[in-house]
């Protein structure tokens, strides 16, 4: 019968696409058996009450551990099972290798553009303002020649594209300057591994130094990346804003930047990321 023949045919209206992001901090805490910390954070935020220094330090240690482990389920599962950081790093290196294999398939028709872009993400974020500079790839490189490769990385959710807006208005997309952008890693734990990838292995003390903020690397870019990751997982498109401002007593305008802009209830919410110990 017709009914029998069409049983397994999926009609487009019945198909729903679900975007799968790396585990966020709340999901990570659940995986570790912690059902208290996130609720305490939410309650403190809603009531605008501080948690206290001791509790804050404990939460920040958990958050830093989450940053370096990352939100990839296999890496989180290894952490929960008590694997060493070196073993977790090995898992993340394998994930990066799988990403590179996927990019290589795309690059058969695009002259390795996506692979090169992906490999330069840590170096790009190391820049003073984190803006993506094509000159780090090729001094003659131009945005229009690489736009498809950047879009592929973002659509594959390997990276998160953050676009400059010329005006901080509610309809952010209307003022998007796509040629001026930042490119974050989709998972911050993978960014940490990518930064350390030139080492044959990542030692335990290296990871512990990251967790306790005792490692002399640009922690700012790691913090920016984790905020971008969390905003994206919460359903926000990523935008930032540059503007000129003349401070009191100054003769010349100076350039300033708002790290992220989010829209909530028809209002713009500026987000500034700081990596200090407090």
Where do the protein language model's features map onto the residues?
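A short, surface-exposed helix-loop junction/capping segment
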Residues: 96-101, 126-135, 202-215
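Interdomain motor-coupling "hinge/lid" segment immediately C-terminal to the ATP-binding subdomain
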Residues: 4-126
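A generic structural signal for short
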Residues: 50-52, 137-138, 215-216
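Non-catalytic, well-ordered alpha-helical scaffold segments
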Residues: 57-61, 66-73, 111-115, 144-147, ...
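A cross-kingdom feature that marks ATP-driven nucleic-acid transaction machinery
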Residues: 148, 154-158, 162-278
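C-terminal accessory/connector segments of nucleic-acid motor ATPases
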Residues: 110-121, 126-166
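Conserved Walker B catalytic segment
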Residues: 1
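Short, solvent-exposed loop/helix junctions and linker helices
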Residues: 22, 111, 140-143, 217, ...
């Amino acid at each position: 019968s017709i009914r029998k023949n069409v049983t397994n045919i999926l009609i487009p209206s019945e198909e729903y696409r679900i975007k799968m992001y790396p585990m966020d901090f709340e999901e990570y805490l659940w995986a570790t058996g912690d059902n208290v910390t996130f609720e305490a954070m939410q309650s403190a935020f809603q009531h605008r009450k501080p948690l206290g220094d001791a509790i804050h330090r404990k939460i920040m240690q958990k958050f830093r551990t989450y940053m370096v482990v990352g939100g990839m389920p296999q890496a989180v599962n290894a952490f929960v099972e008590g694997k060493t950081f070196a073993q977790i790093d090995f898992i993340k290196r394998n994930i990066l290798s799988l990403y590179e294999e996927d990019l290589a398939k795309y690059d058969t028709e695009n002259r390795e553009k996506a692979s090169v872009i992906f490999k330069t993400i840590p170096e790009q974020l190391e820049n003073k303002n984190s803006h993506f500079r094509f000159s780090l790839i090729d001094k003659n490189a131009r945005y229009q020649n690489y736009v498809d490769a950047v879009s592929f990385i973002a659509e594959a959710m390997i990276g998160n594209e953050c676009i400059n807006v010329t005006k901080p208005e509610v309809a952010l997309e209307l003022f998007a300057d796509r040629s001026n952008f930042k490119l974050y890693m989709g998972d911050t734990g993978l960014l940490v591994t990518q930064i350390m990838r030139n080492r044959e292995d990542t030692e335990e003390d290296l990871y512990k130094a990251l967790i306790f903020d005792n490692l002399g690397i640009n922690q700012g870019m790691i913090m920016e990346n984790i905020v971008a990751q969390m905003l994206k997982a919460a359903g926000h498109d990523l935008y930032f804003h540059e503007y000129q401002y003349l401070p009191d007593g100054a003769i010349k305008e100076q350039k300033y930047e708002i790290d992220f802009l989010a829209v909530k209830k028809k209002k713009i919410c500026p987000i500034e990321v700081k990596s200090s110990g407090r």
